[in-house]
């Protein structure tokens, strides 16, 4: 099997293809590398102006080396082999959107550091219980979330109470699984 692509190699290819310098770019796309990227290595720290970073569709197992990305607002890590959220604390003060669907995440430990997070796309992971889901309540600005395809969502959708139970735990949500959240109190208040 071919050796993995390093971040440094991927950045060199990206610079060649786009004619931009990685250290100056606001948006860097390193998705679907062939062979895939396996490690978020220290070369990421060169992306000092990056606001949107895409590393989706690779074989990354751990979130790491984000400390140099002081302006990162959107991080796309969908379709990797990520098992937990450790490593996000480095961008906890700036990250507004985390796209991390199609991974192997069971536990949401560490999510509480994401104080600016508004959008969380984490469909098709392995979250099974409400105790983990409830940790999302520690995100003060979270308003748009996709959680479809997690065992917890599948079980409660089958029982017919997913939306109600999820919104009860995350009352600030405006959108869940692509659908606007309509709150009962608001509806009743509108009629008076």
From Swiss-Prot:
Keyword terms of this UniProt record: Cell projection, Cytoplasm, Cytoskeleton, Dynein, Leucine-rich repeat, Microtubule, Motor protein, Repeat
Broad class of the protein's primary localization: cytoplasm
Domain LRRCT: 150-192
Record flagged with keyword Lipid metabolism: no
Subcellular locations according to the entry: Cytoplasm, Cytoskeleton, Cilium axoneme
Complexes and interactors: Interacts with DNAH5, a outer arm dynein heavy chain. Interacts with tubulin located within the A-tubule of the outer doublets in a ATP-independent manner.
Note: Outer (ODAs) and inner (IDAs) dynein arms contain the molecular motors that generate the force to move cilia by ATP-dependent reactions. There are two mechanosensory systems that monitor and respond to the mechanical state (curvature) of the axoneme. One system involves the central pair microtubule complex and radial spokes and the second system involves the outer dynein arms.
Protein name (record): Dynein axonemal light chain 1
Species, as recorded: Xenopus tropicalis
Gene expressing this chain: dnal1
